Every structure is written in C-alpha cells, then in structure tokens.
Design a protein with these regions (language model features):
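Acidic, glycine-enriched catalytic cores built around paired aspartates
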Residues: 1-232
C-alpha cells in the first residue's frame, strides 16, 4: 500500500499512526490497512516470511546471553526463545502506540504465535499453514496458538471428524508444535460479561492455563471475546 501500490504515502501513514486513527482521513487509511494489506495467518508466503524473519532475529539475539548455568554442564547455558505471552499481550498492548496494521493504541497485541484477532480470514487450515512456517524447533520456550470454535459447530458429527483430521494434519504433516481451543460462542461470553451471576461455572482457556471467565479482568475478557471464531 505504501511502497509498491503507493496508495498511501509514508507521511500519511505516519500521521495516521500518530493520530491513532481518530480523524476522518486517518480512519480512511486505517480501513485500507485492515482490509487491503495482507496479514499473517492466511497462508500468504510473502507475509508469513516477514514473521519468520523477525522470529529468527529474536532467536539469534537470545543466544548471545548466557544464563546462570553457563559453563556448568550440558543442560542450559543460554537463554531460549518462546512465544507464550500468556495474557501479557493485553498489558503490552496497553503500553504500545498505534501500529501500521491498523491496530489502535492501547489495544491488545496478538497473543503467542496466533494471528491478530479477526485478521485470519481464510479458515483454520490457513492459520495452521502460516504457523507451520515458523522455526518452532528453535522456539524451545513454547509456541502458543489459540483457536476458538462454537459448540454449535461441533454439534455435528461430521464437523467433529473434520476438526480431528485438521489437528492430525497439523501435527503429522505440518509438524505443528501446539494448539489449544476454546469451544464457546461469542454470545455466551458477552452474556457472561454482562451477567456474571448466570455463568459462575464458565471456564475458558486463556493461554497456557484455564480460568473461570468471571475472575479475569475485563481487558482479558475482551481479548478472548475478540478471538476469531473459526469455521470448517
């Protein structure tokens, strides 16, 4: 949009970011960034490779810093990379200005190695294929991938078989590292947020752990609600 198609000038993009996409012109640019710029999680090699490149820089940099076990035996010695942000993506996003993908300031970043919410538009297979391109053999601190489907989707036996085949393909053919699911509808989560007394037993998968939905901060609740609901 900026350097190839030249639909947006660098100055226009920078001003829109500083404006946090609040003015009418900034909102026009934000809409283009969200809808017209390709995103990670859709099995687009050119885009996914950018994520791989950033991960490789991160991994190589981490190797430069010995830990307290350095020189004390074969186990340990260096620090290692991981993508398990748990729910820190919410707090980290709160301290991050607007970004050139159209994300507004102070909103959550993408969690773990998951695509940004609602940006993975080509279904779960495309997400798995994008994630499989990451150098997971080097990310020994964990590779966190969150996915969400609705109970209605899994109420059909054929869909249960589809998701079983999808998961097997991810791990057996694409050499996947990790995936975890929430099986709950957006409507249920919104109702639980509005009427917590009616959903005291609602448990959700946050990241590397599960928790009662009602005990989570509203920001973390909103982040879980915003996750893409996948279809098959």
């Amino acid at each position: 949009l900026v350097f190839e198609e030249r639909k947006i000038t660098p100055e226009e993009l920078w001003n829109a970011i500083l404006d946090d996409y609040t003015s009418k012109e900034s909102q026009r640019i934000q809409e283009m960034l969200i809808n017209d710029a390709p995103k990670y999680g859709n099995d687009i090699d050119e885009v996914d490779q950018l994520v791989v490149d950033v991960y490789n820089i991160y991994i190589d940099e981490m190797k430069k810093y010995p830990n307290t076990r350095y020189g004390r035996g074969p186990i340990g010695g260096i620090r290692y990379a991981g993508t398990s942000s748990i729910s820190a993506n919410v707090g980290q996003g709160y301290g991050t200005m607007a970004t050139p993908d159209g994300r507004k300031a102070h909103t959550p970043l993408a969690e773990g190695c998951s695509p940004a919410h609602a940006m993975d538009k080509k279904g779960p297979t495309a997400v798995f294929k994008s994630v499989s391109k990451l150098p997971t053999h080097e990310i020994t601190g964990g590779v966190l991938l969150n996915q969400k489907v609705t109970p209605q989707l899994l109420s059909k036996e054929e869909n249960k078989e589809k998701i079983e085949m999808l998961i097997k393909t991810f791990f057996n053919r694409l050499k996947g590292y990790h995936v975890q699911y929430n099986v709950v509808s957006k409507e249920t989560l919104l109702d639980a947020q509005a009427h917590p007394e009616k959903h005291k037993d609602l448990i959700v998968r946050v990241a590397g752990y599960s928790a009662f939905f009602n005990v989570l901060s509203k920001a973390t609740q909103d982040d879980i609600i915003g996750r893409t609901e996948q279809t098959l």
